[in-house]
Amino acid sequence: IIELPKEFKPLITATSTSVIANTIKKYLYARGLTDIDFIKYNIGYCTSGEYGGRVIIPSYNGSNQLNYFVARSYDGNYFKYKNPEASKDIIFFENFINWNVPIILCEGVFDAMAIKRNVIPILGKSLSTTLYKKIITNRVKDIYIALDTDAKDRALEIGEKFLNQGKRVFIVDLPDKDPSDMGFTAFTNHIQLAQELDISSLMMHKLDL
């Protein structure tokens, strides 16, 4: 069982005079987040303890139980991420997912929060077993893969797995910026231009690697 750090403080309940909370909010606003996002994702922070000096982004499963959290430095003085010693074989933000409509897969939590709609961050470049099984056993037909440009080979590898299971796969061609840098509107434009992956285009992509 995973729990939030005992020092966790929800951002939305922070007083307007809290210097630390205001610094964190400024950092998150700069990344395109809003007060509504703070509530939606229950974003918080720690000022002390193992995760002191970090923004905490929790994830909840389909039953709204905590299944993981990401701890991100907001002041540049630490390693960027310090995650809990818990299994990553989970579906991040699962409580927000509708398994009957197209799903977007991206790398990180900030990418997911920028994309906003029916998106799952895979926390890196590899697909968890739980997520893979959930997708292939549900009615979702279309999968959009939006990994960073340096992970094109991984995107194709993931796409091929779903293609072999009869899913429709679209590769979102990102520029040098990742979704969290692009923002919602720019990313939406890119997803509308996403190319469907088939055996022929898969082979062509592989030749380009």
Task: Tell what function each PLM region has.
Residues 1-56, 60-63, 97-98, 133, ...:
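TOPRIM metal-binding catalytic domain and adjacent DNA-binding surface shared by DnaG-type primases
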Residues 28, 64, 145, 179:
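A residue-level signal for conserved active-site and pocket-lining positions in enzyme catalytic cores
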Residues 169-178:
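A generic structural motif
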Residues 55, 136-140, 180-193:
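Short, surface-exposed amphipathic charged segments that create phosphate/polyanion-binding patches used
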Residues 154-166:
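Short, aromatic/basic amphipathic alpha-helical patches
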Residues 48-142:
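Phosphate-handling DNA/RNA-contact segment within nucleic-acid enzymes
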Residues 105, 141-154:
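Acidic beta-strand-to-loop metal/phosphate-binding motif
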